[in-house]
């Protein structure tokens, strides 16, 4: 009788363990499928946004679009705070990522909350990235592979560290490799100034952002995850852009690619 009861107990425990394992497997499968499902939903939104861009460029719409972008992250504290603000304000952005294996949770959150993730090179070490066209292409492809393997999303947009002119004579070869790999690239046409030398206050970041937007109807704003000044100015920047009629969305491959000569 004691043996029978023990066997029953083991059987019940096994059933509970099996159910727990199956539940965990289902949860893992759901989490694995989530990035792809989100990207599919965003693709439909991007199709509509692309049509709006064409109307704006043709002068057939009074709407305006602001693409908020954040480079070099993720970073401790500031990236999460940026995401909190974006969520509170109900807007979306694009995060140009370097290789930050200790910050995968933030990248997953960026995807989960509907933002675009993009490629900003593997190391972001300027000398290493731009040693040659081949070194830059290798950095891009290494980061593509890492993001695909780590978070299940393959970026479709690249931003040259320092902007595309930083590539110098190698820019054409790198751009050709990007196109062959199915990536677009983008620079920017407005900014907070958080990547420039000198002290930056929140007030100055705000004034710089709004003044460089000017009367442009489609803007790509450069900001950086690490900047406390940008973080402090961000709510006011978003509020002002909203008041001026800007729709704030994440970049996508077929969106207007602001590129410098």
Short names for language-model regions:
Residues 1-68, 75-82, 88, 204, ...:
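N-terminal pre-catalytic segment of deacetylase/amide-hydrolase enzymes
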Residues 39-131, 135-154, 240, 256:
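Active-site beta->alpha N-cap acidic-glycine motif
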